[in-house]
């Protein structure tokens, strides 16, 4: 009777779960028989192609918004819109995440596809070499699925077989006991993928070296949560193999990797590609929620000296994701006298032409600059909102700068010239190279500026920080940035640049400062065009490394957010001297924006405060996000383990 009841319970659980389309499916969705699919390499390969799409989009690795939304949860980015109550990101403030939030607890349909690849390829009559490759791809895709669950929630149901109604025991598979067990599954699958994948692969499919980038990434995350030194060794071995044996160098065209000019650059080891026949601007938040919406009437009302001249409204999107001044400050500037790479406000060209003013002297709206638009509405620096809803314990205004009377250059030129080369490829800034062929001005009254539309503080589908993202946007759209325009688009998922970053971090964790600095200097000098770091202490090296990763990997998947979780787990120099596992300082503070005067001779940098934006918070429970409570409740109903993560 006990066996009978357990079987009924397992079947009932299966039936309850398959009522949801994306769960424990036990029947193939294809009309082809298993024999037809798996005894022909071409049909098996087609199934794997479909599984790549399912896994990469289903986990969010190549999902719309995966770059910009997770970046908005770090000091690099901001999500903000005053249109229709869209507001700000709820994870950055922790006001919008509860145990009902789903971060991917139920990935059974994805795992079923991966397990079918592994099982059916093993049992097929294909050549051994074909079997090995297909199995390796199945392990790779399953490893990615497990990894996404591990780094977000820490624990998951590790299904490694193709379930059927008769699998009563497998249907009761428990959650992994802890993060340590979870990462064993992740690392085991990715390691198997590395051993079985070919050295090269077509665009959109994983090679051995793509798998090694993911493996090194996963090993760093695993080490942060388990402190097992073996993961550092594997991270180093994997990253070095990519660097030394792939035969692929860092590209000289960093920006081209992320737009239409060089989408299959050799440095890209794995990308996700969509063609315009079935893709439109609206399908990608990196486009539709980044490009602004600005009308010719807005520009004329704001007295812009550069407006649309062709009659075509180039920017007709719904921008709500923007880079911050915190991000921009990471990009160093080459000193014109010494050649050293320095923060913009420490260079000789800055000191010769500008001076800092006490920020405490800024006390009222419009004090720095102000003008009236044609309709009589005012635009001010600072705005009234800039002085309200600030986060205590942090300066309201971080920097107030003005040109010296003798200055022959304006502040836009001083701040943005001779920057790290990745800056111009990543950020749209005042007077930058034309965007969609249109000259951009972001100073007070500028054509795409904060106050160019109805709201003085921006967020009316236009910038709220003084910047826009350029990385991952397209440079040419016909006829404009509009929701239904067809586009070729791609996401970069793994590349050689990350291998250098992962190597540098692992070497730092082992105390090998010189090796870490050598690794980070590759991207810093080749992609950034900067003088190399000369850091010689652990503290200096961590500072330069974190800066380098933020620049190199900005707005690239979820990299920076999960890097911050690692750095918080490490503590010490990786998190401002705090103890391991303490609050992540940079995720617990406000972010800053820039406001540039009309004549570009004054700049004010202050907190982004509108709609509670300054109220960013990080509590330690966020090191592991919640396992969706509804998922756990279903498990509890059938007598299965259902423990929630601490604090949720």
Where are the regions that the model predicts?
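Long, intrinsically disordered, low-complexity segments
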Residues: 20, 52, 107-108, 185, ...
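Acidic, glycine-rich segments characteristic of secretory precursors and extracytoplasmic regions
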Residues: 20-71, 101, 116, 134, ...
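Short coil/turn linking the two alpha-helices of tandem helical-hairpin repeats
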Residues: 150-157, 201, 221-227, 511
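C-terminal substrate/ligand-recognition segments
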Residues: 401-523
């Amino acid at each position: 009777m006990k066996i009978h009841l357990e079987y009924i319970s397992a079947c009932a659980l299966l039936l309850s779960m398959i009522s949801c389309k994306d769960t424990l499916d036990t029947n193939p969705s294809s009309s082809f028989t298993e024999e037809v699919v798996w005894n022909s390499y071409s049909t098996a390969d087609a199934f794997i192609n479909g599984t790549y799409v399912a896994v990469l989009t289903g986990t969010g690795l190549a999902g719309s918004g995966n770059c910009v939304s997770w970046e908005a949860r770090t000091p690099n980015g901001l999500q903000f819109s005053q249109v229709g109550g869209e507001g700000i990101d709820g994870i950055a403030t922790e006001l919008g995440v509860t145990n009902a939030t789903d971060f991917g607890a139920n990935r059974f349909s994805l795992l079923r596809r991966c397990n079918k690849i592994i099982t059916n390829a093993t049992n097929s009559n294909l050549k051994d070499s074909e079997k090995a490759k297909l199995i390796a791809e199945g392990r790779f895709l399953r490893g990615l699925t497990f990894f996404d669950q591990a780094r977000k929630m820490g624990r998951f149901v590790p299904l490694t077989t193709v379930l059927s109604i008769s699998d009563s025991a497998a249907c009761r598979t428990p959650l992994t006991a802890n993060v340590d067990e979870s990462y064993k599954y992740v690392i085991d699958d990715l390691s198997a993928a590395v051993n079985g994948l070919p050295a090269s692969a077509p665009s959109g499919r994983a090679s051995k070296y793509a798998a090694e980038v993911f493996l090194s990434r996963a090993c760093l995350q695993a080490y942060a949560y388990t402190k097992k030194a073996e993961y550092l060794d594997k991270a180093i071995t994997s990253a070095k193999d990519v660097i030394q044996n792939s035969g692929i160098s860092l590209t000289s065209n960093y920006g081209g990797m992320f737009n239409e000019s060089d989408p299959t650059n050799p440095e890209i080891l794995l990308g996700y590609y969509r063609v315009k026949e079935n893709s439109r601007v609206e399908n990608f938040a990196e486009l539709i929620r980044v490009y602004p919406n600005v009308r010719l009437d807005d520009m004329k009302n704001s007295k812009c000296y550069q407006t649309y001249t062709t009659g075509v409204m180039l920017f007709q999107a719904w921008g709500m994701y923007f880079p911050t001044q915190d991000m921009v400050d990471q990009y160093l500037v080459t000193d014109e006298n010494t050649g050293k790479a320095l923060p913009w406000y420490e260079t000789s060209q800055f000191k010769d032409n500008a001076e800092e003013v006490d920020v405490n002297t800024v006390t009222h709206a419009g004090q720095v600059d102000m003008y009236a638009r044609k309709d009589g509405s005012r635009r001010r620096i600072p705005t009234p909102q800039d002085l309200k809803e600030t986060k205590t314990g942090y300066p309201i205004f971080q920097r107030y700068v003005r040109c010296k009377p003798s200055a022959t250059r304006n502040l836009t030129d001083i701040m943005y010239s001779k920057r790290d080369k990745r800056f111009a490829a990543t950020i749209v800034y005042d007077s930058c190279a034309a965007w969609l062929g249109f000259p951009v001005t972001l100073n007070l009254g500028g054509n795409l500026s904060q106050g160019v539309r109805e709201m003085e503080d921006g967020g009316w589908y236009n910038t709220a920080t003084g910047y826009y993202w350029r990385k991952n946007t397209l440079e040419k759209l016909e006829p404009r940035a509009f929701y239904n325009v067809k586009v070729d688009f791609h996401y970069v998922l793994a590349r050689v640049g990350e291998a250098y970053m992962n190597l540098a971090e692992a070497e730092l964790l082992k105390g090998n400062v010189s090796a870490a600095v050598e690794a980070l200097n590759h991207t810093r000098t080749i992609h950034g065009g900067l003088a190399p770091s000369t850091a010689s202490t652990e503290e200096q090296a961590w500072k330069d490394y974190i800066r380098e990763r933020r620049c190199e990997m900005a707005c690239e998947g979820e990299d920076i957010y999960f890097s911050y979780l690692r750095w918080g787990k490490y503590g010490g120099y990786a998190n401002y001297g705090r103890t391991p596992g303490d609050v992540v300082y940079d995720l617990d503070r406000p972010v800053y924006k820039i406001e540039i005067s009309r004549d570009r001779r004054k700049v004010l940098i202050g907190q982004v405060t509108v709609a509670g934006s300054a109220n960013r918070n990080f509590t330690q429970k966020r090191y592991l996000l919640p396992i969706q409570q509804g998922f756990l409740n279903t498990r509890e109903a059938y007598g299965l383990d259902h423990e929630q993560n601490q604090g949720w």
